[in-house]
């Protein structure tokens, strides 16, 4: 693994649009070195028999079967509204013109 330089840290900061003061370059250089060393360690792990996952816990979507049912007539629904205008519900204005 190649050593991380101050130039590398400045480049990463620039790509991330971070304003990194010069007095913090050494700190971030050391931290990036440790992070990349850890990633290199992870790359050594044999994962050939590990099933790929996207979550640590299995997520199951709870669904029900669709059932056809009678729906109210449009006119009945429109009559339930406090105000209507033709075939539309009338609602209070919330955006200024």
Curated annotation (Swiss-Prot):
Q: Report the enzyme's class at the first EC level.
A: ligase
Q: Which InterPro entries does the record cross-reference, listed alphabetically?
A: Asp/Glu-ADT_sf_sub_c (IPR036113), GatC (IPR003837)
Q: Give the record's keywords alphabetically.
A: ATP-binding, Ligase, Nucleotide-binding, Protein biosynthesis
Alphabetically, the GO molecular function entries are:
asparaginyl-tRNA synthase (glutamine-hydrolyzing) activity; ATP binding; glutaminyl-tRNA synthase (glutamine-hydrolyzing) activity
Per the record, the GO terms for biological process are: glutaminyl-tRNAGln biosynthesis via transamidation; regulation of translational fidelity; translation
Q: What is its EC number?
A: 6.3.5.-
Show the catalytic activity.
L-glutamyl-tRNA(Gln) + L-glutamine + ATP + H2O = L-glutaminyl-tRNA(Gln) + L-glutamate + ADP + phosphate + H(+); L-aspartyl-tRNA(Asn) + L-glutamine + ATP + H2O = L-asparaginyl-tRNA(Asn) + L-glutamate + ADP + phosphate + 2 H(+)
The similarity annotation says: Belongs to the GatC family.
Briefly, what is this protein's role? Allows the formation of correctly charged Asn-tRNA(Asn) or Gln-tRNA(Gln) through the transamidation of misacylated Asp-tRNA(Asn) or Glu-tRNA(Gln) in organisms which lack either or both of asparaginyl-tRNA or glutaminyl-tRNA synthetases. The reaction takes place in the presence of glutamine and ATP through an activated phospho-Asp-tRNA(Asn) or phospho-Glu-tRNA(Gln).
- HAMAP family in the record, alphabetically? GatC
Subunit field text: Heterotrimer of A, B and C subunits.
Q: What is this protein called?
A: Aspartyl/glutamyl-tRNA(Asn/Gln) amidotransferase subunit C
- This protein's species is Prochlorococcus marinus (strain MIT 9303)
Q: Which gene encodes it?
A: gatC
């Amino acid at each position: 693994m190649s050593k991380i330089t101050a130039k590398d840290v400045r480049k990463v900061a620039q790509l991330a649009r971070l304003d990194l003061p010069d007095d913090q370059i050494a700190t971030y250089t050391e931290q990036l070195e440790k992070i990349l060393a850890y990633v290199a360690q992870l790359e050594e792990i044999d994962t050939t028999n590990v099933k790929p996952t996207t979550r640590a816990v299995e997520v199951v979507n709870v669904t029900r079967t669709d059932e056809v049912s009678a729906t109210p007539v449009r006119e009945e629904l429109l009559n339930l509204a406090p105000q209507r205008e033709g075939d539309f519900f009338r609602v209070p204005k919330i955006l200024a013109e």
